[in-house]
Regions:
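Conserved beta-strand in the GNAT
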Residues: 3, 10-21, 29, 46, ...
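Acidic/histidine-enriched, beta-strand-rich ligand/metal-binding domains
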Residues: 83-86, 104-112, 131-136
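Short hydrophobic/aromatic beta-strand element in the GNAT-like acyltransferase core
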Residues: 1-5, 15, 77, 123, ...
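Conserved acetyl-CoA-binding loop-helix of GNAT-fold acetyltransferases
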Residues: 80, 86-102
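Eukaryotic N-terminal low-complexity, Ser/Thr- and Lys/Arg-rich leader segments
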Residues: 27-68, 103-112, 161-164
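Conserved catalytic-core motifs of GNAT/GCN5-like acyltransferases
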Residues: 121-125, 135, 140-158
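Short coil/turn motifs at secondary-structure junctions
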Residues: 21-23, 83, 129-131, 161
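Conserved GNAT acetyl-CoA-binding A-motif
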Residues: 94, 101-127
């Protein structure tokens, strides 16, 4: 996950989970609570490049004209602490996550010579009450609302183009 930490007191004020899309179907192994108390949290110590390479393993691609489209990412579990809302923290998280994915694709892209641009798709399931926030970041609503975890949600999608 991407974590936003306030500099003055090192308090976590927001989190965002970045998932490769489509979400991998292989079963993930999880550490037990006991193992987490005796060792560092999994993922710590991994290089930025290693995490991006792992993310890229699950990407699918298609070439349309001069653009290679990557399946991109699904953002999930986006949360900002109540006392930090309305201060731009959510925007920082989403824009930071998008930049991380774009950097991963640009650094690990393997594309044919006729490709001059990379396209990346971002998706998320938004609670209806914060739909306008995601629309302000360029996401577009896809389909009808649905219930998820007891709250009405809407699927949102955004496509980004970048040079190779």
């Amino acid at each position: 996950p991407m974590v936003l930490i306030r500099a003055c007191d090192e308090k976590v004020v927001g989190v965002l989970r970045i998932l490769s899309w489509p979400v991998p179907t292989s079963l993930a192994t999880y550490d037990t609570a006991e193992s987490l108390t005796s060792v560092d949290i999994p993922g710590r110590g991994r290089s930025h490049a290693d995490m991006q390479a792992a993310f890229m393993q699950h990407q699918t691609t298609s070439v349309q004209d001069d653009t290679c489209w990557y399946s991109g990412a699904k953002f999930g579990r986006i949360a900002v602490s109540k006392d930090s809302r309305g201060q731009g923290c959510g925007r920082l998280l989403v824009e930071g996550a998008q930049a991380w994915v774009v950097q991963a694709v640009r650094q690990h892209a393997s594309v044919p010579a006729e490709v001059h641009r990379l396209g990346i798709v971002f998706q998320l399931s938004s609670q209806i009450e914060v739909q306008s926030f995601y629309e302000s970041l360029g996401f577009q609503v896809q389909g009808d609302s649905y219930m998820e975890e007891g709250h009405p949600h809407i699927w949102c999608k955004k496509s980004v183009l970048t040079d190779v």
